[in-house]
Amino acid sequence: MAFLALGINHKTASVDVRERVAFTPEQLVEALQQLCQLTQSREAAILSTCNRSELYIEHEHLGADSILAWLANYHHLSLEELRASAYVHEDDAAVRHMMRVASGLDSLVLGEPQILGQMKSAYAVAREAGTVGPLLGRLFQATFSAAKQVRTDTAIGENPVSVAFAAVSLAKQIFSDLQRSQALLIGAGETITLVARHLHDLGVKRIVVANRTLERASMLAAEFGAHAVLLSDIPAELVNSDIVISSTASQLPILGKGAVESALKLRKHKPIFMVDIAVPRDIEPEVGELDDVYLYSVDDLHEVVAENLKSRQGAALAAEQLVSVGAEDFMSRLRELAAVDVLRAYRQQSERLRDEELSKAQRMLANGSNAEDVLIQLARGLTNKLLHAPSVQLKKLSAEGRVDALAMAQELFALGEGSTDKPPQ
């Protein structure tokens, strides 16, 4: 049995590649089914966020190259282009990687908590698609437990930092007084919710939430005293917006150069600060060419993020140790499970032989045989039957020169150096 974790992330691939390899929520079930068909496995999950796209697979039949080829073909990339950015982890390394990801140790923002929720969503989607079996199910549960322990036992979650926090921190650097600024937030997901919370806590003058559905926008707006509008209202809202932060799941840009250019004219070229957190991007890159626009992508947030990480570096060392212990413990328990079927079959065979010898002894007693003689024969018969198959196999292994197997058998039967001593009289 083999586990495989492969994919790309913010450290190995540019935003251009990441947005091309991202899965939409609507694609996930179909992609999972294709993946399981390819690997001849019933167990697979896909984690796709703005910073990473990863496949988690239990497999026996295919190597990583075949799965990478499927991923490249699915997203219409050349295999060479994908391979240049991809990483592959197997078995113990795959388990450790998943636990590091869920704990926020592999995130753009060290220790950020959102990734655990995204990992749980990936697990839920895979379960709904019927592609999580007992092995991958155990791995996800162990991963969640490890991430929880990291949060509980280390300070990695203190001094909150995230992509959302980094975006707001950058806005603070550009606008000295956020209380006089107006913000337009595009989207209504988890990241935008965090952005809204940070801006609200900083006392931003006015917040507008634009979303595909007014109902979802209104729910988020109500939480922070903001205003809700539809995506179609964005051009009008741009005129009054000093800060624009966008994070949707749209496959096409929502905000283009023309709309921003028109808004700037009406604003008399008062600057607009924009952060596009989405992958694929919500804001056309050409918008950044405008003189009075400060446009940042996810990749541009690295420097801001670095300033907020210093307090977490020490905690990360302790977290890495917890993850290593968790991964080792999981693999140890998994290997123990591999012996369960063998032990069950051996026990059933032993019980069958016991019952045969016991029935024979009971018949002898019923026929008047001496009880002591019956017990001796029962013990001798049971011993001979239990040792017959192992004896035959050991002689065969010895004839074949399998010294390693003989040494393993000695360990299996706990035959120490003193095992040949005569029993006490």
Swiss-Prot record:
Pathway field: Porphyrin-containing compound metabolism; protoporphyrin-IX biosynthesis; 5-aminolevulinate from L-glutamyl-tRNA(Glu): step 1/2
UniProt catalytic activity: (S)-4-amino-5-oxopentanoate + tRNA(Glu) + NADP(+) = L-glutamyl-tRNA(Glu) + NADPH + H(+)
Any one GO molecular-function label of the UniProt entry: glutamyl-tRNA reductase activity
List of catalytic residues: 50
Binding site for NADP(+): 187-192
Residue sites binding substrate per the record: 49-52, 107, 112-114, 118
HAMAP family per UniProt: Glu_tRNA_reductase
Listed PANTHER family: GLUTAMYL-TRNA REDUCTASE
UniProt subunit comment: Homodimer.
The protein, known as: Glutamyl-tRNA reductase
Organism from which the protein derives: Pseudomonas syringae pv. syringae (strain B728a)
